[in-house]
Amino acid sequence: DFNHVDFSYAGEGGNLSLKDVNLHIKSGQTVGIIGGTGSAKSTLVQLIPRLYDVTKGNVQVGGVDVRNYNLEVLRDQVSMVLQKNVLFSGSIYDNIRWGDEHASEEEVRRVCKLAQADGFVSEFPDGYDTMIVQGGNNVSGGQKQRLCIARALLKKPKILILDDSTSAVDTRTDALIRKAFREEIPNTTKIIIAQRVSSIEDADQIIVLDDGKIAGVGTSEQLLKTNDIYREVYESQVKGGGDDE
């Protein structure tokens, strides 16, 4: 829950990046966040694991103000995958198990299947023992994103945040990832920031952000009727072919 949240990178008295944000997200929901560049989409989700603290108001997880959690406990419950997450040099196994170093081989494969990574990993001659070079430059952007999603899933988070982290994945694979989320981790709250409408179209609720304020909340169907910003983005992508297949 976000309760009357204001946020400024400069603290009290600074220019507000987020203004009076009120938001209720039910446990297990899939929530999409969309908005133009500079609408503070990433800033909003970074307040959940306390990468930053609110300037005013509060953010709650499970009914408790995030500032009242032990930071390690809070961050164990929240997994965030960025658009440009990093892989380090080592095997694919080692990279995934960074999410939980005690995970079994079976668990690693399970999360890779969820993230639609098992298929391409299994095709590598060395499979999960394939060595990743520093920065992950020997796998494609879309493969890297899927491995990072798998790593985040291994933590078994209560809240999974994807910050434009399927941007390099084709829309079919993106849809398969979301289907797997719905079927296999229904109790995990999933927050998806996206540029592509197709990535969030089937979300339980979509939040439209504009200049740090909530400009609309609803399902895709509702927002198409009531929200000009969402409708414009939707029509430009769907009719303009801006959504790659």
Model-found features: residue ranges?
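ABC-type nucleotide-binding domain
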Residues: 1-245
